[in-house]
Structures are given as C-alpha cells and as structure tokens.
A protein has these predicted regions:
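Protease-associated
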Residues: 1-74, 83-86
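Residue patterns forming the tRNA-binding/recognition surfaces of aminoacyl-tRNA synthetases
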Residues: 18, 36-38, 65, 69-159
Length: 159
C-alpha cells in the first residue's frame, strides 16, 4: 500500500480504541522494489488460459499512471480491458485473458458464466467476502462510458 494513503485506508481500524495506533508499519519498499514479485491470484479461473499462452502471470508490474489521489496506490491490471492496462500488458508480456464475451457476459471459465459483467460485480465481492479475502469495498465515484442511445454501460473490449 502506498505510504501516503495509509491513514486514509487504515486510519479507522482503531475506531473501538482511538488511543491505540490504527496500524504499524513493519517494512517499507518502493514500487520498483516489488516489481516482478509473485502473488497468489484471488480466483484461479484464468490459470489455465495463462498456461496455454506460456506466459507468466500474477506478478507485480509498475507504471506511472497509478496515483495517490484515492485507493491504495495499487491497481489491478487487465490487459484485455483498457488502454493503460493493454500498454502495461505489452510492456511486461502479460497473458491476454478474456473472461468476458462479446455480449458482455462472464465466460464459462468464471464462477459466473452468462452473467453480465456489471451485474457480476456484487457476486465477485460476495465471493471474496465469503473467502475472507475482502478488506473493504468502498464505492468510488468515477466517470464510466455509457451508450448514448440506450444508456447501458460500455465495455472497453480488446480483441
């Protein structure tokens, strides 16, 4: 987590005992120190796809578009969705994983096949919570593209 965001993200952990520190910093690293370090995926639905492409996945990448304005200073990269993510994916030769079909539905590799990607959001959060892998799920207000004709969410879909 970015040092500048510690208080914002973790500062309320001591709500029941405000006299106690909310958190303790045990070690400090730069983003570059963590580059290429492996991590365990939250879901394993893309593991086989990555293996078929003979590409390494699930390691830390770095890029300059990550900011300290909100969140944790850590972002998820999905090279199949979004220009910045696609650029980072090419830079690090990440596998191209497409778990959403052309209609915007989750694919059979996921736990939610056939569910529209935006309707899957609460299902994903619930699965993470059930597995005790969810720290928090704050709602962030941000602009999101919608169809000018029918006002449905658009998906940036790389082919």
């Amino acid at each position: 987590m970015a040092e500048a965001l510690l208080d914002t993200v973790l500062g309320k952990l001591n709500a029941e005992n405000p006299e106690a520190p909310a958190y303790e910093v045990l070690e400090t690293y730069t983003g570059k120190d963590l580059e290429y370090k492996a991590y365990e995926p939250l879901f394993d639905c893309a593991v086989d796809i990555c293996k078929k492409q003979n590409k390494k996945a699930y390691y830390i990448t770095c890029d300059t578009y990550v900011t300290l304005t909100d969140g944790t200073g850590v972002v998820h990269i999905a090279p199949a969705f979004g220009e910045d993510d696609a650029n980072v994916g090419r830079k690090y030769d990440l596998p191209f994983v497409q778990l959403v079909d052309g209609k915007g539905d989750m694919t059979k590799e996921t736990p939610w096949p056939g569910v529209f990607v935006k309707k899957a959001d609460p299902l994903v959060l619930q699965a993470l919570e059930d597995a005790h892998l969810l720290f928090a799920a704050p709602k962030f207000e941000h602009s999101y593209p919608h169809c000018w004709r029918c006002d449905t969410p658009l998906i940036y879909y790389c082919l």
